[in-house]
Amino acid sequence: LNPPAQVWADMGISERMGDVLGQAVESKPLKEVQEHPEKVTHLAIIMDGNRRFAWKSKIATGLGHRIGKQKLETVLDWVLELNIPWFTVYALSTENLTRPQEELDILFKLYIEGLRDIAEDERIHANEVKVQIIGRRELLPEDVNEAIDYAENKTAAYDKYVFTVCLAYGSREEMLNAIQSIAAEHAAGDLPLDAIDETAV
């Protein structure tokens, strides 16, 4: 979805011209996927730039995040339209948890709202989309975890599509955990040194 009329107005752009610009930006990645010589089976995106967009547009940071959430719904439509079975969104890294609490509260509220909405979304059930969340859930508030459980439980039986949301997730931490796990297996005598290869990692 394109930013609301007030956002375009604040940027000195008419609502109609804003719609044209938004559609032009949206059509490019969609066209690239459609014209790719090989079928795309996994689309992964990083939810980044909402704050910068808000600052440049001179709107509240919270509104920038909400516009980003709306854009995600558009991308989900693309995924279903193009029949891409795996869709992953990197929404919140562990590093992001150091942001001001006021901004985190806005994000957590959006996650709760989004997870509960998607659990009831007709598109999700009609297309049998399994929703799963990965990351360090112990770092998230209880109400966010409750929304995660709700969305996962409502879609647990589906397997046609998999929609993964990364919350409180960090790739560096994941690599560290993998290294620690391999070291523990080796120390216990369950994994010989010469057996540690790309497959083990």
What are these regions (language model features)?
Residues L1-V201:
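Flexible, compositionally biased loop and terminal segments
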